């Protein structure tokens, strides 16, 4: 059986990247929460 996680840099960036997060209200909320927490990396 094929494993479920087949990594792709493009798919990762498009689904979880900074620009995608900024494109929705809830995505911006995620970024704000990560900034508040002091995350070094905000998005993929």
Swiss-Prot record:
Region of interest called Disordered, as start-end residue ranges on this chain: 1-44
Record keyword Ribonucleoprotein present: yes
Keywords associated with the record: Ribonucleoprotein, Ribosomal protein
Gene3D superfamilies for this protein: 1.10.287.3980
An example Gene Ontology CC term for this record: ribosome
GO annotation, biological process: translation
Taxonomic superkingdom: Bacteria
GO molecular-function term, one example from the UniProt record: structural constituent of ribosome
InterPro entries, per the entry: Ribosomal_bL34, Ribosomal_bL34_CS
NCBIfam families in UniProt: rpmH_bact
Family: Belongs to the bacterial ribosomal protein bL34 family.
Name of the protein described by the UniProt record: Large ribosomal subunit protein bL34
Lineage: Bacteria, Bacillati, Bacillota, Bacilli, Lactobacillales
Designated gene of the protein: rpmH
């Amino acid at each position: 059986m094929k494993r479920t996680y087949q990594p792709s840099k493009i798919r990762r960036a498009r689904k979880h990247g900074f620009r995608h997060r900024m494109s929705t209200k809830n995505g911006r909320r995620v970024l704000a929460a990560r900034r508040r927490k002091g995350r070094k990396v905000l998005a993929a």
